[in-house]
């Protein structure tokens, strides 16, 4: 027989195999929405097909081993392409991937397949993954968050309001004893949580074990004084998985309620390992998104944060940082609330105005509390309460520790402001229009809040948003 029978070597157009506009998507498919900017002269169908091919079964040439498998069963398919309104030479390409292409319960494998290779592709000037639809069948292979929102409230015995946190500053340079002292002052003043900064791991000036011990002491002392359950996010992120687990185990032995992980720098494999340990041992897990802007900041290349947020809900975490919205543009507010809902809710309808490309059903996977953190202070409290609602964590670092009288009064000011906003909202007042008045009224009864109002009355962070539709 001749070698050429049934197999023709050579390079052929991707779109012949991988562009299938009449494909009906299956309930079990993983669906992706990519924003493509093709190179000049590359038609969008060919670019979309190339993305589908290179992120699934394809390679740059036909190979004889293609005959040993059923490509129709395993190939990714570009099933729809639409131009992006208001942008020149940008398209949204929708790609469907058969479920069989992915390992169960592995966010790592999902990302390696979908975004591992194709972003360096020459036919594309730029590529951004805007959204993923995770099918129910795949969601069910993940444990998800160790505990979720309801279980966390039950553990903490705190209901009907957002939770309050604070990142301990200066983030690097304090000794363990002084660090613990700062934690104690914040918790005593009325915060629910304090937080290790994301880059506090185990450095020469403060080794992790010493920090854990002094923070545990601070937690127990503050709990005894206030009669409330307190926590400090002990950062277990480390250079190896084994070291990370050692830190998590020690936190459990100390009896503290919560640990922390940097999920992008630490990696999804490490994060999922830690999340499983946390569920098995009753630890809450706070997730910081350090490095996210490297991936999600460019509008035309990388990955939108909503994809990283979905991935975190699958991998596991009880809190995740999600931006603040405050003082930014309206468009960004809708987009942020879109992925905040993806983190918290069980079922989210497709809504392009909020950046949600697909309807997502989480089939009772526990929810994640969004954390608003970064440049916020007491004057932002009404807006934050209105935007994020009860199921959130509001974190004021400088907005607590920058109080002229110290940490504990700074914590008091934030707690009073929060309780005032929640009470006003429950009485039916409009936080958006009456916010400043509500804070001013409350400050008459709280000298700590009055001092905070005075010091931060003029501070704003006004820059145009990067992230528009």
UniProtKB/Swiss-Prot annotation:
The record's Gene Ontology cellular component field reads: chloroplast
Kindly provide the PTM information from the record.
The disulfide bond which can form in the large chain dimeric partners within the hexadecamer appears to be associated with oxidative stress and protein turnover.
Q: What is its EC number?
A: 4.1.1.39
Catalyzed chemical reaction(s) = 2 (2R)-3-phosphoglycerate + 2 H(+) = D-ribulose 1,5-bisphosphate + CO2 + H2O; D-ribulose 1,5-bisphosphate + O2 = 2-phosphoglycolate + (2R)-3-phosphoglycerate + 2 H(+)
Family (UniProt): Belongs to the RuBisCO large chain family. Type I subfamily.
Q: Which GO terms describe its biological process?
A: photorespiration; reductive pentose-phosphate cycle
Q: Does the keyword Glycosyltransferase apply?
A: no
Q: Locate the residues binding Mg(2+).
A: 195, 197-198
Q: Please provide the record's keywords in A-Z order.
A: Calvin cycle, Carbon dioxide fixation, Chloroplast, Disulfide bond, Lyase, Magnesium, Metal-binding, Methylation, Monooxygenase, Oxidoreductase, Photorespiration, Photosynthesis, Plastid
Note on how the cofactor is bound: Binds 1 Mg(2+) ion per subunit.
The residues that the entry says bind substrate are: 117, 167, 171, 289, 321, 373
Chain positions with N6,N6,N6-trimethyllysine modification: 8
Q: Which residues carry this modification: N6-carboxylysine?
A: 195
State the top-level EC class: lyase
**Miscellaneous section:** The basic functional RuBisCO is composed of a large chain homodimer in a 'head-to-tail' conformation. In form I RuBisCO this homodimer is arranged in a barrel-like tetramer with the small subunits forming a tetrameric 'cap' on each end of the 'barrel'.
Q: Which Pfam families does the entry link to?
A: RuBisCO_large, RuBisCO_large_N
Q: Where in the sequence is the signal peptide annotated?
A: none
What this protein needs as a cofactor is: Mg(2+)
| Domain of life where this protein originates | Eukaryota
| Name by which UniProt lists this protein | Ribulose bisphosphate carboxylase large chain
Task: Tell me the compartments it is located in.
Answer: Plastid, Chloroplast
Q: What does this protein do?
A: RuBisCO catalyzes two reactions: the carboxylation of D-ribulose 1,5-bisphosphate, the primary event in carbon dioxide fixation, as well as the oxidative fragmentation of the pentose substrate in the photorespiration process. Both reactions occur simultaneously and in competition at the same active site.
Tell me the PANTHER family matching this sequence. RIBULOSE BISPHOSPHATE CARBOXYLASE (PTHR42704), RIBULOSE BISPHOSPHATE CARBOXYLASE LARGE CHAIN (PTHR42704:SF15)
Q: What is its main location?
A: plastid
Q: Self-association or partners: how does it assemble? A: Heterohexadecamer of 8 large chains and 8 small chains; disulfide-linked. The disulfide link is formed within the large subunit homodimers.
Recorded GO molecular functions are: magnesium ion binding; monooxygenase activity; ribulose-bisphosphate carboxylase activity
